[in-house]
C-alpha cells in the first residue's frame, strides 16, 4: 500500500478516475449526437410517425448521457486548481484561451440547441429543429477540438516560451500553440473513435430489440444506419490511426519506444501479444512480425527507431531522462494498453464487417441470434479501445506532464513530479479519492438505470404528443403538455 503515502501518485489516480468516468459519457455524447441528427434528418424528409418516434427516442438517450458528461467534466477542471496547482500555474497562460473557448463557444452551442431539441418541437419550424440537432452535434465536436488542443499542447508544446524564473509557459503565438504538431492527427483519431462508439451503441440497442422481437421496424432502420456508419468510421480509422502513430514516432520517441517495449534501437517488430519484463528490458513470450511496426510507421521493414536506452544516452532530454528514470517507467503498462487498443480495433473491424454484410443480405441479422448477441456486447470493444488509447497517450508521456517534444522550443517542459499541489496531503487525497469512487458509482448506476428504462420503453409512436400535435396543427393551437409531448412531431 505504498501508493497511499505518495501524494503525486494519489493525485494522478484521482484524476485518472475522474477522466475515465468522464470518458464513458463523452464518446456516447458525440457518437449518439450524430445518430440523433441522422434520425431527425430522416424524419424531416419522411414526416412519418415512426421516424418521429425514433428521433425522440435517441434525443432522450443522448440527453441523459450529456447531463452526466457535463457533471463529470466540471470535476476534472476543478482538480487542476486543487491537486495540480503548480501545473495550473505553468500552463495557465496557454490553457486559458482553449478552455474559455470550449465553454463559451462549444458548450453554450450544445446547451442552447439541446434546449430546442427538448422543449421546442412544437414551437419552432421543422427546418430550425433539424438545424438545431446538427448544431448540438457540431457543438460536441467543437468541444472535443478545444480539449484536444489543450491536451495536444501538453504532448507537443509550441507557440510558447518559458518565463524568466522558469515557472510558467508564456504564450507567444496562439495559432502555433493551438495547431501544434499533434493536434490534427490526434483530433481526427479521437473523434473517429468516439463516432465508432456511437455507431456500436446504436447497433447494440437495435440488436437487443431484434433479439426480443420488439420495435423490429425501428431496430432494422437503426441497424442499417449503424452498420453503414460503423463501416465508414472504421475504414477512416485505419488512416487516422496510422497517421497518429507516425506522428508519435516523430514527435514523442520515448512514448513510441514504450508502446513497443523497445529499450534498444532496432527495426521495431509488430507484436500481437507479449509481456515486457522491465527488469531484463525484454519483451517475453512474443508473437510478432519482425520490423512490422517500422513498416507501418515508415513504409520500410528495416527502419530503425531508438529505444529508451538510446534516448537516455543521447542526452536529448538532459537530466530528466536517464537510466534511473527508465527503471521507474511503467513500460509494460503502456505496452499492454497500446496492444489492447489494437486488439479491440480488430474486434471492431470484424463486428462491423459481419453486421454490414448480414444487414444488407436480405436483413438476415434479424434472425441470427449469435450475431445479435455479438452486437449487444460490441460497445465494449470501442469503449476499451478508447480507454486503452487514453492510457497509452497519457502514461506514455511520463515522466513529463508537458512533454519536451522535438518541435518545441528548448526548455518548455514540465515533470509530473513537479506539477502537484504541495499543500495537499496523502490522507486528504485518499479520502477524496474514496468519496469520488462512491459518488461516481452512484451517478453511473443512476445513469444506467435511466438509460435501461428508456430502452425498455423504446420508441413509442402512440405518445400523447402525437395526437395533440395533430390537433394543434389543424386548429393552430399549441399546448406545452409534458416533456414527451414537447419533443413530439417537429414543424408544428
Regions found by a protein language model. Name each.
Residues 1-492:
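Polytopic transmembrane helical bundles with strong interfacial aromatic enrichment
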Amino acid at each position: 500500500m505504498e501508493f497511499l503515502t505518495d501524494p503525486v501518485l494519489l493525485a494522478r489516480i484521482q484524476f485518472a478516475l475522474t477522466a475515465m468516468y468522464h470518458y464513458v459519457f463523452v464518446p456516447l455524447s458525440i457518437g449518439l449526437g450524430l445518430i440523433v441528427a441522422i434520425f431527425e434528418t430522416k424524419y424531416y424528409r419522411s414526416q412519418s410517425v415512426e421516424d418521429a418516434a425514433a428521433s425522440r427516442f435517441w434525443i432522450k438517450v443522448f440527453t441523459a448521457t450529456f447531463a452526466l458528461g457535463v457533471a463529470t467534466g466540471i470535476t476534472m477542471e476543478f482538480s487542476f486548481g486543487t491537486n495540480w496547482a503548480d501545473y495550473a500555474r505553468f500552463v495557465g497562460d496557454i490553457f486559458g484561451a482553449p478552455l474559455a473557448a470550449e465553454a463559451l463557444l462549444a458548450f453554450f452551442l450544445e446547451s442552447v440547441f439541446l434546449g430546442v431539441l427538448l422543449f421546442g418541437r412544437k414551437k419552432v419550424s421543422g427546418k430550425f429543429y433539424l438545424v438545431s440537432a446538427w448544431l448540438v452535434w457540431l457543438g460536441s465536436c467543437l468541444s472535443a477540438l478545444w480539449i484536444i488542443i489543450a491536451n495536444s499542447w501538453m504532448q507537443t508544446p509550441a507557440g510558447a516560451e518559458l518565463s524568466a524564473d522558469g515557472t510558467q509557459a508564456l504564450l507567444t503565438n496562439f495559432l502555433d500553440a493551438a495547431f501544434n504538431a499533434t493536434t490534427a492527427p490526434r483530433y481526427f483519431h479521437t473523434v473517429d473513435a468516439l463516432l465508432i462508439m456511437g455507431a456500436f451503441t446504436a447497433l447494440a440497442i437495435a440488436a437487443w430489440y431484434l433479439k426480443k422481437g420488439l420495435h423490429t421496424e425501428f431496430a432494422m432502420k437503426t441497424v442499417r444506419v449503424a452498420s453503414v456508419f460503423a463501416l465508414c468510421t472504421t475504414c477512416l480509422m485505419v488512416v487516422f490511426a496510422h497517421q497518429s502513430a507516425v506522428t508519435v514516432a516523430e514527435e514523442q520517441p520515448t512514448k513510441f519506444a514504450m508502446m513497443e517495449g523497445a529499450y534498444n534501437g532496432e527495426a521495431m517488430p509488430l507484436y500481437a501479444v507479449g509481456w515486457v519484463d522491465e527488469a531484463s528490458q525484454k519483451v517475453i513470450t512474443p508473437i510478432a512480425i519482425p520490423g512490422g511496426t517500422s513498416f507501418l510507421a515508415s513504409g520500410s521493414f528495416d527502419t530503425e527507431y531508438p529505444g529508451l536506452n538510446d534516448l537516455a544516452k543521447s542526452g536529448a532530454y538532459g537530466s530528466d531522462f536517464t537510466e534511473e528514470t527508465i527503471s521507474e517507467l511503467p513500460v509494460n503498462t503502456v505496452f499492454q494498453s497500446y496492444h489492447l487498443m489494437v486488439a479491440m480495433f480488430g474486434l471492431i473491424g470484424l463486428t462491423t464487417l459481419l453486421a454490414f454484410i448480414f444487414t444488407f443480405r436480405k436483413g438476415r441479422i434479424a434472425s441470427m441470434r449469435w450475431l445479435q448477441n455479438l452486437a449487444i456486447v460490441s460497445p465494449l470493444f470501442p469503449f476499451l479501445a478508447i480507454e486503452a488509447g487514453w492510457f497509452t497517450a497519457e502514461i506514455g508521456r511520463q515522466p513529463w506532464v508537458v512533454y519536451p517534444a522535438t518541435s518545441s522550443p528548448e526548455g518548455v517542459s514540465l515533470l509530473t513530479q513537479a506539477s502537484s499541489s504541495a499543500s495537499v496531503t496523502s490522507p486528504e487525497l485518499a479520502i477524496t479519492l474514496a468519496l469520488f469512487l462512491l459518488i461516481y458509482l452512484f451517478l453511473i448506476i443512476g445513469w444506467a438505470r435511466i438509460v435501461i428504462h428508456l430502452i425498455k420503453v423504446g420508441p413509442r409512436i402512440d405518445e400523447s404528443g402525437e395526437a395533440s400535435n395533430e390537433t394543434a396543427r389543424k386548429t393552430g393551437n399549441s399546448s406545452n403538455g409534458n416533456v414527451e409531448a414537447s419533443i413530439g412531431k417537429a414543424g408544428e
